[in-house]
Swiss-Prot record:
The gene is MT-ND1. It is a multi-pass membrane protein. GO terms for biological process: aerobic respiration. Belongs to the complex I subunit 1 family. The lineage of its organism: Eukaryota, Metazoa, Chordata, Craniata, Vertebrata. It comes from the Eukaryota. This is NADH-ubiquinone oxidoreductase chain 1. Core subunit of the mitochondrial membrane respiratory chain NADH dehydrogenase (Complex I) that is believed to belong to the minimal assembly required for catalysis. Complex I functions in the transfer of electrons from NADH to the respiratory chain. The immediate electron acceptor for the enzyme is believed to be ubiquinone. GO terms for cellular component: mitochondrial inner membrane.
């Protein structure tokens, strides 16, 4: 039964990811005054299917000097971790309702660094290794900010359980009261998922696609799926943390529809930023985090610790 549940849970995510690639190409096309994919199927709707067939029927190749085991394991692990992040997310009901859902997500997002590092090192290519090292430095750096923001939200929520955030936001979105945290969280998710303007790990002009430069066919598709799955997962997390709404037990489909629409709006914002912004310089990226975001998140964390004590009240305990 659990296997069926997992399949029913992962299949729509992978389907959404497949069509997200089409939406991205269409949105970027119209923003650049062109059509985007419009040949395969009506209005180009079958383009993701054609891409999948092409990638998974090609023969996967690897460099003769690469480390075989690590080279093959890295994309599989990347996709597995990306899909596992969805397990505790309440949409409005989670696959497994974890008491420490916030910590589980933090742990998995930290582990997602390893497949990138393995792929860069195992490829035995200087471009792949430089891209991997950039990715590790960037991801670990922004993990600190994400963890501090999550700690602040946890203090407001009074629990590590993600489902409680729906109850905390019954009267008002946390976006209204914690908008500086929400802004820093959104920018940090862009950096965490290696999206424009923080796509330094995949700098086409300087690193020839970055850590996955030596990958082709199925393994490349797995990295691609993992990246876009992480984008959707981070936007789903943003919706849960800052745009949550109380669960209507009489009409549960309304909750799911509301959650999906909010996540899609945030994903569209990701695409809009990609079409509009140039790439940051690497030193600017690090300065933004260590000199701006980290002091601010620490200050807000202390603020949210001190307010309940000062007002002689505690966060809502469920």
């Amino acid at each position: 039964m659990l296997t069926i549940n997992i399949l029913l849970y992962t299949s729509p995510i992978l389907l959404a990811v497949a069509f997200l690639t089409l939406v991205e190409r269409k949105v970027l096309g119209y923003m650049q005054l062109r059509k985007g994919p419009n040949i395969v199927g009506p209005y180009g709707l079958l383009q993701p299917v054609a891409d999948a067939v092409k990638l998974f029927t090609k023969e996967p190749s690897r460099p003769a000097t690469s480390s075989t085991l690590m080279f093959i394991t890295a994309p599989i692990m990347a996709l597995t971790l990306a899909l596992t992040i969805w397990v505790p997310l309440p949409m409005p009901h989670a696959l497994i309702d974890l008491n420490l859902g916030v910590l589980f997500i933090l742990t998995l997002s930290g582990l997602s660094v390893y497949p990138i590092l393995w792929s860069g090192w195992a490829s035995n290519s200087k471009y792949a290794l430089i891209g991997a090292l950039r990715a590790v430095a960037q991801t670990i750096s922004y993990e600190v900010t994400l963890a501090m923001i999550l700690l602040s939200i946890t203090l407001i929520n009074g629990s590590y359980t993600l489902k409680n955030l729906a109850i905390t936001q019954e009267n008002m979105w946390l976006l209204v009261s914690t908008w500086p945290l929400a802004m820093m969280w959104f920018i940090s998710t862009l950096a965490e998922t290696n999206r424009t303007p923080f796509d330094l790990t995949e700098g086409e002009s300087e690193l020839v696609s970055g850590f996955n430069v030596e990958y082709s066919a199925g393994p490349f598709a797995m990295f691609f799926l993992a990246e876009y799955t992480n984008i959707l997962a981070m936007n789903a997390m943003t919706t849960i943390l800052f745009l949550g709404s109380p669960i209507n037990h009489n009409f549960t489909h309304i909750n799911t529809l509301s959650f999906t629409l909010k996540t899609l709006m945030l994903t569209f914002l990701f695409l809009w930023i990609r079409a509009s912004c140039p790439r940051f310089r690497y030193d600017q990226l690090m300065h933004l985090l260590w000199k701006n975001f980290l002091p601010l998140t620490l200050a807000f964390c202390l603020w949210y610790i001190s307010i309940p004590i000062a007002l002689s009240c505690i966060p809502p305990q469920i």
